[in-house]
């Protein structure tokens, strides 16, 4: 079963302090297990999506303030990683180049998790067609959720790339896609634009 998740009983604490970890592992049922990245350059498609879904689950369970708190905490972790590596370090890009024998373990950091999450929040905002900061209103969120559901259904039991995801987004949200600087998001080092 590609969607089977094993969870140690220690994560099921009575105070629910580890609920985000359980939500993260459940989210991997879709991003990582049902659909996975073709190569390690596209690892953000596993972990960025998983963090995005995890935080959406937490939002449903505990409200927007928990979503915002976790998003801010993740952004702080991303900033710490970028500060530690350096704002121009090639391992701070969302889609790192791994040619020439670069070990994917050497690139492993918070970048695919948190920069990927921020990118997906941005894409969701752009899909809403709204210019204000409150784009998680029903229109954009529901349209993006439907898009992600279709993405996972179309790609199930397969592998995905950033280019393939970009093409799917462009097909679903052509006007929004025109405004997205994919190259900067995917290949520019440092913090998100």
Question: Model-predicted segments: where are they?
Answer:
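Hydrophobic alpha-helical and helix-loop surface patches within well-folded domains
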Residues: 1-193
């Amino acid at each position: 079963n590609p969607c089977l998740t094993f969870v140690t009983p220690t994560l099921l604490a009575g105070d629910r302090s580890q609920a985000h970890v359980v939500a993260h592992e459940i989210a991997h049922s879709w991003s990582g297990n049902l659909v996975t990245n073709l190569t390690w350059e596209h690892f953000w498609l596993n972990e960025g999506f998983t963090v995005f879904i995890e935080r959406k689950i937490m939002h449903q369970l505990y409200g927007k303030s928990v979503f915002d708190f976790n998003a801010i905490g993740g952004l702080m972790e991303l900033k710490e990683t970028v500060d530690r590596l350096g704002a121009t370090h090639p391992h701070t890009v969302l889609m790192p180049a791994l040619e020439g024998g670069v070990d994917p373990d050497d690139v492993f950091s918070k970048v695919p998790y948190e920069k990927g999450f921020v990118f997906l929040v941005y894409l969701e905002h752009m899909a809403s067609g709204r210019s204000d900061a409150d784009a998680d209103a029903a229109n954009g969120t529901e349209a993006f959720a439907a898009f992600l559901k279709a993405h996972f259904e179309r790609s199930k039991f397969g592998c995905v790339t950033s280019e393939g995801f970009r093409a799917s987004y462009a097909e679903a949200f052509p006007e929004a896609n025109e405004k997205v600087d994919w190259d900067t998001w995917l290949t520019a080092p440092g913090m998100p634009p």
